[in-house]
């Protein structure tokens, strides 16, 4: 029986993580979780899983939950999030929160020698050097939950990582993969939220449409697998059947395939190095699929992917700036305050405005994050 703490239980990854726990009640126990403002959902999860600690975003929601929570301790805010991440009984902390708020809980959980199931891209994007240094220092495993990084992780099992020639990350292309840049001037929030292959939260769905999601994944892959950016490629693959590939020095390429179902990489992170049945996921049927398509990625068409490569290669504090600018811009787009292509413009402005710090401390990263958010808000 593995004890799990789940950060971000009400989001897309969080709800699917609970599906995995539900499928294997003899294997996993939920000891703590966090939610944002979805209190009704939190009540249902408490009643089903009887965790010891639950964290909510707002203090005013604590009393509401205490009234129905029985023996579950209710905490709130950033301190509450840390309490969930540091639950003494938790062996695995699944970080499924959205945004850079996931950074500090991840670092503290690593220091407490918890195994980390990392679904929060922004943690490695904003502070990859700090996170990987901490993981090495405390001998902690970072197990990828993203389908692409899980695919690479699985392809590398038993392999000599020094023999990697290239990582090939696949991208569905998102909601607007077939639109020209001229057409993108007129797209709506509702258009952007209709992803062709995956069911995800609103922020990551917009990131998929701008291709920033893939850019974040490139930076994340750089840190997780220690591969230079020059050896990380992105290829358009509309069907989302091949989740990513690894090319080795002898030009052999290993790929991980499967139907699009996020529960598969989530479960693998929880069961690694073992596997368990996931009987209700769709079996891959290649002869029904017939043809798989691949296209070269155009970084002028998808400018956010280019920004991510530039930020990653620049290094230091630049990825944190790019990420903070993106979070603010995406939120403004979701609120219909800016157009779709303005997201790119705001990110570019923030990156051009920033003076890079080569090896920022945690405090500097948090300060830069806040300053970038203020700068972008002033531009809107």
UniProtKB/Swiss-Prot annotation:
Cofactor: Mg(2+); Mn(2+)
Enzyme class: oxidoreductase
Pathway(s) it belongs to: Isoprenoid biosynthesis; isopentenyl diphosphate biosynthesis via DXP pathway; isopentenyl diphosphate from 1-deoxy-D-xylulose 5-phosphate: step 1/6
EC number: 1.1.1.267
Amino-acid positions noted as binding Mn(2+) in the UniProt annotation, renumbered to this chain: 146, 148, 217
Signal peptide per UniProt: none
GO biological process, one term: isopentenyl diphosphate biosynthetic process, methylerythritol 4-phosphate pathway involved in terpenoid biosynthetic process
Domain of life: Bacteria
One of the record's GO molecular function terms: manganese ion binding
Annotated keywords: Isoprene biosynthesis, Manganese, Metal-binding, NADP, Oxidoreductase
Pfam families (alphabetical): DXP_redisom_C, DXP_reductoisom, DXPR_C
Binding residues annotated for 1-deoxy-D-xylulose 5-phosphate, in chain numbering: 121, 147-148, 172, 195, 208, 213-214, 217
Residues holding NADPH: 10-13, 36-38, 120, 122, 201
InterPro entries listed in its UniProt record: DXP_reductoisomerase, DXP_reductoisomerase_C, DXP_reductoisomerase_N, DXPR_C, DXPR_C_sf, NAD(P)-bd_dom_sf
Catalytic activity: 2-C-methyl-D-erythritol 4-phosphate + NADP(+) = 1-deoxy-D-xylulose 5-phosphate + NADPH + H(+)
Family matches, as HAMAP family: DXP_reductoisom
Role played: Catalyzes the NADPH-dependent rearrangement and reduction of 1-deoxy-D-xylulose-5-phosphate (DXP) to 2-C-methyl-D-erythritol 4-phosphate (MEP).
The family this protein is said to belong to: Belongs to the DXR family.
The name this protein goes by in its record: 1-deoxy-D-xylulose 5-phosphate reductoisomerase
Organism of derivation: Bacillus cereus (strain AH187)
């Amino acid at each position: 029986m593995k004890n799990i703490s789940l950060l971000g239980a009400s989001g897309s990854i969080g709800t699917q993580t609970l599906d995995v726990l539900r499928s294997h009640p003899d294997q996993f126990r939920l000891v703590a979780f966090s939610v944002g403002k979805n209190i009704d959902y939190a009540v249902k999860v408490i009643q089903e899983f009887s965790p010891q600690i639950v964290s909510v975003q707002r203090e005013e929601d604590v009393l509401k939950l205490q009234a129905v929570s029985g023996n579950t301790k209710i905490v709130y805010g950033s301190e509450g999030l840390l309490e969930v991440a540091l639950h003494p009984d938790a062996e695995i902390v699944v970080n499924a929160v959205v945004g850079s708020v996931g950074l500090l809980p991840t670092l503290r959980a690593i220091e407490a020698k918890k195994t980390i199931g990392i679904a929060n891209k922004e943690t490695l994007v904003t502070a990859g050097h700090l996170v990987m240094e901490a993981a090495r220092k405390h001998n902690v495993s970072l197990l990828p939950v993203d389908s692409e990084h899980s695919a690479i992780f699985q392809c590398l099992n038993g392999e000599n990582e020094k023999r990697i020639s290239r990582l090939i990350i696949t991208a569905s292309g998102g909601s607007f993969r077939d639109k020209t840049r001229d057409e993108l001037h007129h797209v709506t929030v509702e258009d952007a939220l209709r992803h062709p292959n995956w069911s995800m939260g609103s922020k990551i769905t917009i990131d998929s449409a701008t291709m920033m999601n893939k850019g974040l994944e490139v930076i994340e892959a750089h840190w997780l697998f220690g591969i230079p950016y020059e050896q990380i490629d992105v290829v358009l693959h509309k069907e989302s059947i091949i989740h990513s590939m690894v090319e080795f020095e002898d030009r052999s390429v290993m790929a991980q395939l499967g139907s699009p179902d996020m529960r598969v990489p989530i479960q693998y992170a929880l069961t690694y190095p073992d596997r368990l049945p996931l009987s209700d996921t769709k079996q891959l049927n290649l002869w029904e699929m017939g043809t798989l398509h691949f296209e070269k990625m155009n970084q002028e068409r998808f400018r956010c992917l280019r920004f991510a490569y530039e930020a990653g290669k620049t290094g230091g504090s630049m990825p944190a700036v790019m990420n903070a600018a993106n979070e603010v811009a995406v939120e403004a787009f979701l609120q219909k305050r800016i157009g779709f292509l303005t997201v790119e413009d705001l990110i570019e402005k923030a990156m051009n405005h920033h003076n890079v710090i080569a090896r920022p401390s945690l405090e500097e990263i948090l300060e830069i994050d806040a300053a970038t958010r203020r700068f972008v808000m002033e531009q809107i």
